Amino acid sequence: EGTRPGDSAADVLARCDGVACEDTRVTGKLMKHLGLSKPLWRYDDHANERDRARLVESMHDRAIALVSDAGTPLVSDPGYRLVNDCRAAGVAVTTLPGACAVVAGLTLSGLPNDRFLFGGFLPSKEKARRDVLEELGSVDATLVFYETGPRLLKSLAAVSEVLGAREVAVARELTKLHEECRRGLPDGLTAYYDANPPKGEIVLLIGPADPGDVEHDIDALLTEAMTELKASQA
């Protein structure tokens, strides 16, 4: 079943034949709030190829809605595999606009948003985290990552060490009662959140490098290369 322009999520949930969701308990509460009763199928990080195949097969004669517990499905979410399989099987797919922490964080932060790069969650291991920041640090765009409260301080420390004094924003609990967005340099934010441990879901945004800083980095690399070349020729 196709959706009409302007359809809301509630419209689609009312008309669909069933719902694939991260947690049937969470989505069950939503359906109850809407006064709806539909079959619910769990689809999360643990879903395998067989689970997807069953869902795709059911979609040839039924309309199935895919929802997440929070935010937009498929953004840092396993739903993209299901959509990929649907397209491969010739199943029609459509989407609805909705809440997305990446976009909400960008608009709230005030950092440049004409160009941005979403990197999902930063790795939990220190070296891997540094490697990602070094790899993406030269991109002329605002970098956006998802983060958790317990790991935020380590990520801010890595940003300070790898990228230096770049403007950073920490947005958390977006669209909720305790929404907060703090902006500053990594060391200052580290001090604040060390004294005020953050809770909830977090979006970490890192502003692009100042053009002057990039030129300085290039000059430093050239100087280092020339020094190594002279040493090898000595």
Please annotate each region the language model reported.
Residues 47, 70-78, 124, 152:
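Acidic, metal-coordinating catalytic cores used for nucleic-acid/nucleotide bond scission
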Residues 25-27, 101, 151, 210:
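Alpha-helix capping/helix-boundary segments
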Residues 41-50, 122-125:
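Conserved helicase motor
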Residues 12-19, 90-94, 142-143:
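Short active-site oxyanion
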Residues 81-139:
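Class I SAM-dependent methyltransferase SAM-binding "motif I" and its flanking Rossmann-like core
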Residues 52-100, 104:
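Glycine/small-residue-rich loop that forms an oxyanion/phosphate-binding "nest" at active or ligand-binding sites
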Residues 1-46:
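Glycine-rich, flexible N-terminal cofactor/catalytic loop recognition
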Residues 63, 142, 149-233:
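A contiguous loop/helix-start segment that scaffolds small-molecule binding in enzyme catalytic cores
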